[in-house]
């Protein structure tokens, strides 16, 4: 070889696509690879990825779900433009391998990578594959999945998650050394989760004072004031935060996590080895958050409550019925279903397929 190998990561739109792509990018860069990212100027990747000193290429292409007739009518033209932009980017970058991590932009770029003979690796983060990956899986050299049996011929690698989660102590060591009230971590994500913000304070208020858990509740900057008002109205003390810098430590300190069921959240809960109650976002595409959560809940490794069934009374009863030994068993089962080597495995496959 005349120089370092080059990885082109295609990912955009949401953190669920971008963060696992970054994990693989860092792993290969530590091995001497050059990394370039292909995304959309309007996606979160446009501001997040450059902070990791990764150069970017951009194409213009968006989704169709929920869009009007004009957008659908213009699809052929927009797709043709995205194809040409992808070809130009691929010729500039000359990647040794292309890694598609999801998002609409992966479709035109992935198709052109295959057409130009570049090795194409796909990774699907959710339990139900997105439309772009369903199509690209037919032309990809390797198909990788975070959950079992998501795409035909796919290898179950798990989701690449933040490295520090794999280094946490075993659930048995963490749970056995605790005493006193349960510790509950509520995670709403960067945008918050209004249903959790409303129901959790009311549920805790229904518990007798001596049976109340210690609560840390993360809600996102836009909802933090409302959340704090909800706890004040319920007369429940809680640590309320707009964001959490050290999620690994937050997971490690919790007996129970109450959260949505995005692919990365489910994977992080398993990797950390912590008990969880998943409340899937009811409007997720193809209801994929429910099937994400079922990967753990059907094995007794998590609880699953649909948002329509989430009430203060029901949540209070559930919390009152849980014991630390029960939660420890749940956490142990969750850790057993984790794929701690996901980042290394995806990077390894990229290395195997790379060519000049």
Curated annotation (Swiss-Prot):
InterPro entries in UniProt: GlcNAc_MurG, Glyco_trans_28_C, GlycoTrans_28_N
Q: List the disulfide bonds.
A: none
The species this protein belongs to is Cupriavidus necator (strain ATCC 17699 / DSM 428 / KCTC 22496 / NCIMB 10442 / H16 / Stanier 337) (Ralstonia eutropha)
> A Gene Ontology CC term for this entry?
plasma membrane
One of the protein's GO biological processes: cell division
Q: Which HAMAP family match?
A: MurG (MF_00033)
- Which reaction is catalysed here? di-trans,octa-cis-undecaprenyl diphospho-N-acetyl-alpha-D-muramoyl-L-alanyl-D-glutamyl-meso-2,6-diaminopimeloyl-D-alanyl-D-alanine + UDP-N-acetyl-alpha-D-glucosamine = di-trans,octa-cis-undecaprenyl diphospho-[N-acetyl-alpha-D-glucosaminyl-(1->4)]-N-acetyl-alpha-D-muramoyl-L-alanyl-D-glutamyl-meso-2,6-diaminopimeloyl-D-alanyl-D-alanine + UDP + H(+)
What residues bind UDP-N-acetyl-alpha-D-glucosamine, as annotated? 14-16, 126, 162, 190, 244, 289
Q: What is this protein called?
A: UDP-N-acetylglucosamine--N-acetylmuramyl-(pentapeptide) pyrophosphoryl-undecaprenol N-acetylglucosamine transferase
**Its biological purpose:** Cell wall formation. Catalyzes the transfer of a GlcNAc subunit on undecaprenyl-pyrophosphoryl-MurNAc-pentapeptide (lipid intermediate I) to form undecaprenyl-pyrophosphoryl-MurNAc-(pentapeptide)GlcNAc (lipid intermediate II).
Coiled-coil blocks: none
Top EC class for this record? transferase
Q: Which UniProt keywords apply?
A: Cell cycle, Cell division, Cell inner membrane, Cell membrane, Cell shape, Cell wall biogenesis/degradation, Glycosyltransferase, Membrane, Peptidoglycan synthesis, Transferase
- For this protein, what is the EC number? 2.4.1.227
The molecular function terms of the Gene Ontology recorded here are: UDP-N-acetyl-D-glucosamine:N-acetylmuramoyl-L-alanyl-D-glutamyl-meso-2,6-diaminopimelyl-D-alanyl-D-alanine-diphosphoundecaprenol 4-beta-N-acetylglucosaminlytransferase activity; undecaprenyldiphospho-muramoylpentapeptide beta-N-acetylglucosaminyltransferase activity
Q: Where in the cell is it found?
A: Cell inner membrane
Q: Which pathway does it operate in?
A: Cell wall biogenesis; peptidoglycan biosynthesis
Which family is this protein grouped under?
Answer: Belongs to the glycosyltransferase 28 family. MurG subfamily.
A matching Pfam family: Glyco_transf_28
Bilayer disposition of the protein:
Peripheral membrane protein
């Amino acid at each position: 070889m005349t120089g370092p190998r080059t990885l082109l990561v295609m990912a955009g739109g949401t953190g669920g696509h971008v963060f696992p792509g970054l994990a693989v990018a860092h792993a290969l860069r530590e091995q001497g690879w050059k990394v370039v990212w292909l995304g959309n100027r309007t996606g979160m990747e446009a501001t997040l990825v450059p902070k990791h000193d990764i150069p970017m290429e951009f194409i213009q292409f968006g989704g169709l779900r929920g869009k009007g007739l004009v957008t659908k009518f213009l699809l052929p033209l927009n797709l043709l433009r995205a194809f040409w932009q992808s070809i130009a980017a691929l010729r500039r970058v000359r990647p040794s391998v292309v890694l598609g991590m999801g998002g609409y932009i992966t479709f035109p770029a992935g198709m052109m990578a295959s057409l130009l003979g570049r090795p194409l690796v796909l990774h699907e983060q959710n339990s139900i594959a997105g439309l772009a990956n369903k199509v690209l899986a037919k032309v990809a050299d390797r198909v990788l999945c975070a959950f079992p049996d998501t795409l035909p011929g796919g290898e179950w690698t798990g989701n690449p998650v933040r490295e520090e989660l794999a280094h946490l102590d075993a659930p048995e060591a963490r749970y056995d050394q605790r005493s006193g009230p349960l510790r509950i971590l509520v995670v709403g994500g960067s945008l918050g989760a209004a249903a959790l913000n409303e129901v959790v304070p009311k549920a805790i208020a229904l518990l007798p004072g001596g049976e109340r858990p210690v609560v840390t509740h993360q809600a996102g900057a836009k909802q933090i004031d409302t959340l704090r008002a909800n706890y004040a109205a319920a007369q429940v003390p809680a640590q309320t935060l707009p964001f959490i810098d050290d999620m690994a430590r937050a997971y490690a300190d919790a007996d129970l996590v109450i959260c949505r069921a995005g692919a990365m959240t489910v994977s992080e809960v398993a990797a950390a080895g912590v008990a969880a109650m998943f409340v899937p976002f009811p409007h997720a595409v193809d209801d994929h958050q429910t099937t994400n959560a079922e990967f753990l809940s059907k094995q007794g490794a998590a609880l699953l409550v649909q948002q329509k069934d989430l009430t203060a009374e029901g949540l209070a009863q559930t919390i009152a019925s849980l014991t630390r030994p029960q939660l420890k068993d749940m956490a142990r089962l969750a850790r057993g279903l984790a794929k701690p080597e996901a980042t290394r495995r995806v990077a390894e496959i990229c290395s195997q397929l790379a060519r000049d």
